[in-house]
Swiss-Prot record:
Native organism: Sus scrofa (Pig)
Keyword check for Signal: no
Task performed by this protein: Coenzyme A-dependent lysophosphatidic acid acyltransferase that catalyzes the transfer of an acyl group on a lysophosphatidic acid. Functions preferentially with 1-oleoyl-lysophosphatidic acid followed by 1-palmitoyl-lysophosphatidic acid, 1-stearoyl-lysophosphatidic acid and 1-arachidonoyl-lysophosphatidic acid as lipid acceptor. Functions preferentially with arachidonoyl-CoA followed by oleoyl-CoA as acyl group donors. Functions in phosphatidic acid biosynthesis. May regulate the cellular storage of triacylglycerol through activation of the phospholipase PNPLA2.
Motif (HXXXXD motif): 327-332
Residue numbers of N-acetylalanine PTMs: 2
GO annotations of cellular component type: cytosol; lipid droplet; mitochondrion
Domain notes: The HXXXXD motif is essential for acyltransferase activity and may constitute the binding site for the phosphate moiety of the glycerol-3-phosphate.
Listed name of the protein: 1-acylglycerol-3-phosphate O-acyltransferase ABHD5
Length: 349
């Protein structure tokens, strides 16, 4: 990966065809250049030296990658996988601390951010495999032997899936508020049944991608993000006083919905995974230590850590709660989060 930034092609397979992609630029005030500028505004505030550029994988695809290092080569690198709808820029509050004593890599998942946005399969298992293989090809391209793999949300699910398939490459698996672990509860067993109107709305929205509303909103999409998620501006207020982060999130999610469509094909109504990870994680190599980090104030079910422990009774599994943090643990309480992650990484070396 070159030290200087290299421009990525903006003509991936799914961008060359289809009425939607031809219509989007005229309706949504976005482009790959807008996304690049939004990312650059974020990275300018990162307090450490980094290299960025595309890593080429198969089928002409590229994985947009950031490497941070203080010329430390004898430590196992930490690799960060962002969640659904995110990008590598959202780790801005963490880069400075995490790279002090080991190399840190962050990249935009295939189909997200500034990485290529190809057409994914429609089968959930094959989609998962496409993501996993893109991570493995990325690792091979960079010549990394073993890594500490950390994933948030969707990134946590994919980190676990990768660890299942390529256990010899993972020194420690860190799951941060992971998506897709429990199976959907039986509606009849829920203490608070889902109201009929919500079920009807869910059925009506099933044909659409999760973030289609942003693209439909067109020129009003950015203000929609700012109104619906003002918390992101607060989370990053120590680094940015303006709408830098919400602009970045907007431009990440109004491009061609490649990864978004892939995610939709991995889900069943109300956002549950078609292939829950708890059904498989017991088969993971018992030598891989697993740490599960949750926000104590998160609305996401935090019982997956306990479930993983019961499914891997003879393996290292530790659950860590970050006080005062919600689902976006790394942004809600970055200092505590960074400290816990560094402590985990130190046990590996």
């Amino acid at each position: 990966m070159a030290a200087e930034e290299e421009e990525m092609d903006s003509t991936d397979a799914c961008e060359r065809s289809g009425w939607l992609t031809g219509w989007l630029p005229t309706w949504c005030p976005t482009s790959t250049s807008h996304l690049k500028e939004a990312e650059e505004k974020i990275l300018k505030c990162v307090p450490c030296i980094y290299k960025k550029g595309p890593v080429r994988i198969s089928n002409g695809n590229k994985i947009w990658t950031l490497k941070l290092s203080h010329n430390i080569s004898n430590k196992i690198p930490l690799v960060l996988l962002h969640g659904f709808g995110g990008g590598l820029g959202l780790w801005a509050l963490n880069f400075g601390d995490l790279c002090t004593n080991r190399p840190v890599y962050a990249f935009d998942l295939l189909g997200f951010g500034r990485s290529s946005r190809p057409r994914f399969d429609t089968d959930a298992e094959e989609v998962e495999n496409q993501f996993v293989e893109s991570i493995e090809e990325w690792r091979c391209a960079l010549g990394l032997d073993k890594v500490i793999l950390l994933g948030h949300n969707l990134g946590g699910f994919l980190a676990a899936a990768y660890s299942l398939k390529y256990p010899s490459r993972v020194s420690h698996l860190i799951l941060v508020e992971p998506w897709g672990f429990p199976e959907r509860p039986d509606l009849a067993d829920q203490e608070r049944p889902i109201p009929v109107w919500i079920r009807a709305l869910g059925a009506a929205l099933t044909p659409f991608n999760p973030l289609a509303g942003l693209r439909i909103a067109g020129p009003f999409g950015l203000s929609l993000v700012q109104r619906l998620r003002p918390d992101f501006k607060r989370k990053y207020s120590s680094m940015f006083e303006d709408d830098t982060v919400t602009e970045y999130i907007y431009h990440c999610n109004v491009q061609t919905p490649s990864g978004e469509t892939a995610f939709k094909n991995m889900t069943i109504p109300y956002g549950w995974a078609k292939r829950p990870m708890l059904h498989r994680i017991g088969k993971m190599n018992p030598d891989i230590p697993v740490s599960v980090i949750y926000g104590a104030r998160s609305c996401i079910d935090g019982n997956s850590g306990t479930s993983i422990q019961s499914l891997r009774p003879h393996s290292y599994v530790k659950t860590i709660a970050i006080l005062g943090a919600g689902h976006y643990v790394y942004a809600d309480q970055p200092e505590d989060f960074n400290l816990k992650v560094k402590e985990i990484c130190d046990t590996v070396d």
